[in-house]
Amino acid sequence: MNKYFTCYVVASLFFSGCTVQHNLINETQSQIVQGHNQVIHQYFDEKNTSGVLVIQTDKKINLYGNALSRANTEYVPASTFKMLNALIGLENQKTDINEIFKWKGEKRSFTTWEKDMTLGEAMKLSAVPVYQELARRIGLDLMQKEVERIDFGNAEIGQQVDNFWLIGPLKVTPIQEVEFVSQLAHTQLPFSEKVQANVKNMLLLEENNGYKIFGKTGWAMDIKPQVGWLTGWVEQPDGKIVAFALNMEMRSEMPASIRNELLMKSLKQLNII
């Protein structure tokens, strides 16, 4: 994405103020500000990691965490790209929500992936082989055109269609991710409403006390340093949408649940849930 970014930095742990103009898919502009919350800063410190939580409400974006510069730094999207992969595949009729992707008995990275599953089931299990198969069906040329059409991250997918989101060259910033997922939450992406609704249904993580939390995790294990994501949105009881993108440095010994733990604690701290 072509972005104009200006920032004023004070000699402290935080940015004093920050504004951004964006050329988004729907030509909106977002204002980005530092969210002053030392508690969330400490949440990341306590896990001995660096990270940022980007929150978008309407056109206002707030940054929290102990490494705010990550918000405008590019990282491989890892399995958060499954959201766009599914949108492209469904829109172009390379699959449908009822198709069963067959497991052929091969050894997979996790035993939970060693079964037949639909695209939605594979989304919830983050089953990489299913989405690699979908990417191969889409093909390199169409995938490149669609990623460019959506203006996702640096829009570079290279010459191998089934791993560019895991090891590069595709990269995206947390700010770009939160803008993308906010448009998905509001059904504003340039895909059919039906396709967007189907993908949103795949992303429901939790429903409690009138709040719905949608999201997709990502963990880039094959790059150094490793990168973790949890990107999605909260639908509040009154229907208001609050989008989020958590991005952090991961280590092999960390539990996968650390991303959800940090997100949920932070959302509660901010009175979003």
From Swiss-Prot:
Lipid attachment in record (S-diacylglycerol cysteine): C18
Keyword field: Antibiotic resistance, Cell membrane, Hydrolase, Lipoprotein, Membrane, Palmitate, Signal
Membrane topology reported for the UniProt record: Lipid-anchor
EC primary class: hydrolase
Molecular function, one GO term: beta-lactamase activity
Superkingdom: Bacteria
Catalytic activity: a beta-lactam + H2O = a substituted beta-amino acid
InterPro entries cross-referenced by the UniProt entry: Bact_Transpept/Beta-Lactamase, Beta-lactam/transpept-like, PCN-bd_Tpept
Cellular component, GO annotation: plasma membrane
Localization, UniProt: Cell membrane
NCBIfam families in alphabetical order: bla_class_D_main (NF012161), blaOXA-23_like (NF000266)
Entry protein name: Beta-lactamase OXA-133
